[in-house]
């Protein structure tokens, strides 16, 4: 099985000029955690999602924790008002201003083998990966794949059928 067997095509996308507020609204309305950002030709530019949005709303002091745990944030005097202020600062800015530029964004291709896909999803900090067709310097977005797609692929592909032979099903318990 490869990524093309389980990926979601025809995904919702953002333009680089779309605002953070628009992105948040679309994520909420469509119940998705990540939205790929593409140019006018459908070429992949980056990914904007809830993880990035959460990072933008954190107090600056929280970003300087380094190796310390986020559970140590109780000392910050931040209130919802300050978070609202940070939201108003970024809401009307384009998502292109906040795409991850420092790290290499992980992606897969339609032909990525299932074991490699599992490893990429495990390595990724996001809950989904863009599926890209790479031709030279261009990266054409053709879909997205998530942990839920993998789960559905395992169940629908009966990959676990043999592993459960002779075991009672959940329906029989």
For each of these PLM feature ranges, what is it?
Residues 1-26, 32, 38-45, 70-123, ...:
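Bateman/CBS regulatory modules and CBS-like beta-alpha motifs in cytosolic regions of diverse proteins
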Residues 32, 44-61, 126-127, 140-158:
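Short beta->alpha transition motifs characteristic of CBS
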């Amino acid at each position: 099985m490869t990524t093309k067997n389980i990926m979601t095509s025809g995904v919702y996308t953002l333009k680089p000029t779309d605002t953070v507020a628009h992105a948040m609204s679309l994520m909420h309305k469509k119940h998705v955690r990540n939205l790929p950002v593409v140019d006018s030709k459908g070429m992949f530019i980056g990914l904007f999602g809830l993880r990035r949005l959460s990072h933008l709303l954190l107090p600056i002091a929280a970003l300087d924790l380094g190796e310390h745990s986020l559970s140590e944030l109780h000392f910050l005097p931040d209130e919802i008002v300050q978070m609202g202020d940070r939201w108003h600062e970024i809401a009307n800015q384009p998502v292109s201003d906040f795409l991850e530029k420092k790290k290499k964004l992980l992606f897969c291709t339609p032909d990525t083998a299932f074991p490699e896909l599992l490893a990429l999803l495990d390595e990724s900090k996001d809950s989904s990966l863009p599926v890209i067709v790479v031709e030279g310097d261009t990266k054409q977005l053709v879909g997205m794949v998530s942990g839920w797609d993998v789960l559905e692929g395992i169940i629908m592909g009966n990959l676990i059928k043999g592993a459960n032979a002779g075991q009672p099903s959940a329906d029989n318990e």
